[in-house]
């Protein structure tokens, strides 16, 4: 008996060691996700500095920043397939290294370097959340997986808030734009090395090796042949855009230049939206599961976003802009619910690809809306006769996006348990 026990214990110890290694790798990938969101949101607190850095206008800066979403959306499709084909060790650290190199390139005061750097940032960032979910699924028991993914999402949102609320005061105290981007680039590259060292090698299935990389793209045919997938992407994209573009690119400039807030107050107010995400994402997800329905939570949250946007722009009630932006951020957490719906309206064997598919659709829509907002409204920030009316026009643009999200939501299939036949039959 002792001989068999001795033979089995090394295998068990090896399994436990590998599980711990996956948890450690997940931890570093969560840091990756935090830093990725900080990189995404921090340009909003340095628009004027970036204009001087690249010797271009605010519209030119918006164009440079917007190219991030071109590569982020397209690489979202590649990231999931790369994880399945190559494993985490040979894909996620590479994505993080690309993000770090993109930050270093962004520090070069040349528009072309800024464009390429931002493209690299978007491409590398696409591996963060997907990689964290992949590693969490291998490091945590099934009963803790949802908690691990929820914690990952919250940390990412904190990164978005830190990119404004922490970086803003640093810039205000005189930190040079060049120094910031070199510094964060080096930090990201160091964490990428630690991630590579900590991530264990995996035994990939023979079906993956035989099928080749192209076979991993076939599930996307299933996802993109389902009209509900597009509806999920449109709804999530319309709810994400007011935060990713309206707040994380134009928020600080709008409050500072249109409403004449101090730089410090503008940064604090803008940072309330990603801080609201930290609470809104898990809260609204829990509420959706609790009532067993998806659509009412999406529609109700979009309506709250519209009311909060109207309050911020027209202030009919004695509610501060800071609180209004926080409420807006909490409600925008409903943008994550279509990520659950797209998995529920597609077959079980393509759920991973469904996540990549909705990421692609969401940020492709973001990439389309960004230039529209920049040309129609953003370019006039601080440069029009009636600044208050200009701010209100910007708010109405995002309120219209939320209204359109509500309309499209009515065409979504209700996938909550309360709508299932067994839930209503007795």
Predicted ranges, named:
Residues 41, 69-77, 160-161, 274-282, ...:
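Residue-level signature of mid-helix packing/kink "hotspots" within the transmembrane helices
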Residues 74-112, 288, 295:
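Conserved MFS/SLC helix-loop-helix module at the cytosolic interface between two early adjacent transmembrane helices
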Residues 24-58, 246-252, 369-373:
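Extracytoplasmic
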Residues 43-45, 226-284, 366-374:
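Extracytoplasmic gate region of multi-pass secondary transporters
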Residues 117-155:
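Cytoplasmic helix-loop-helix junction between adjacent transmembrane helices
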Residues 102, 112-120, 319-327:
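Paired small-residue
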Residues 7-19, 202-233, 426:
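Juxtamembrane intracellular "pre-TM" segments in multi-pass secondary transporters
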Residues 178-196, 392-410:
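Symmetry-related core transmembrane helices of the 12-TM Major Facilitator Superfamily/SLC fold
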């Amino acid at each position: 008996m002792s001989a068999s026990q001795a033979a089995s214990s090394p295998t068990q110890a090896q399994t436990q060691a590998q599980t711990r290694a996956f948890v450690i790798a997940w931890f570093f990938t969560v840091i990756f996700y935090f830093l990725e969101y900080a990189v995404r949101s921090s340009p909003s607190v340095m628009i004027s500095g970036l204009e001087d850095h690249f010797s271009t206008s605010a519209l030119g800066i918006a164009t440079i920043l917007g190219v991030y979403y071109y590569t982020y959306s397209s690489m979202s499709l590649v990231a999931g397939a790369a994880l399945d084909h190559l494993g985490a060790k040979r894909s996620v650290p590479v994505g993080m290294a690309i993000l770090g190199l993109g930050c270093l390139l962004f520090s070069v005061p040349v528009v072309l370097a800024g464009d390429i750097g931002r493209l690299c940032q978007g491409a590398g960032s696409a591996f963060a959340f997907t990689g964290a979910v992949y590693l969490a699924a291998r490091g945590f028991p099934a009963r803790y997986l949802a908690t691990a993914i929820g914690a990952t999402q919250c940390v990412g949102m904190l990164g978005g808030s830190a990119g404004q609320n922490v970086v803003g005061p640093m810039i205000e105290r005189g930190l040079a734009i060049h120094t910031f981007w070199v510094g964060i680039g080096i930090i990201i590259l160091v964490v990428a090395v630690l991630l590579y060292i900590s991530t264990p090698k995996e035994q990939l299935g023979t079906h993956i090796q035989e099928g080749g990389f192209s076979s991993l793209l076939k599930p996307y045919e299933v996802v993109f042949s389902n009209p509900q997938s597009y509806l999920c992407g449109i709804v999530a994209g319309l709810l994400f855009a007011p935060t990713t573009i309206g707040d994380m690119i134009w928020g600080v400039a709008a409050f500072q230049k249109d409403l004449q807030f101090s730089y410090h107050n503008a940064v604090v107010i803008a940072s309330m939206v990603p801080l609201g995400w930290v609470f809104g994402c898990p809260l609204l997800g829990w509420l959706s599961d609790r009532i067993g329905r998806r659509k009412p939570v999406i529609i109700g949250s979009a309506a709250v976003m519209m009311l909060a946007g109207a309050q911020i722009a027209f202030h009919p009630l004695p509610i501060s802009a800071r609180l209004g932006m926080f409420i807006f951020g909490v409600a925008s957490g409903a943008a994550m619910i279509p990520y659950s719906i797209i998995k529920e309206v597609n077959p079980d064997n393509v759920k991973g690809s469904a996540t990549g598919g909705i990421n692609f659709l969401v940020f492709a829509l973001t990439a389309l809306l960004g230039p529209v907002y920049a040309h129609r409204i953003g370019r006039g920030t601080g440069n029009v006769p009636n600044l208050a009316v200009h701010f209100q026009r910007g708010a109405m643009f995002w309120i219209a996006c939320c209204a359109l999200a509500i309309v499209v939501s009515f065409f979504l299939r209700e996938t909550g348990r309360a709508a299932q036949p067994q839930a209503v039959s007795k």
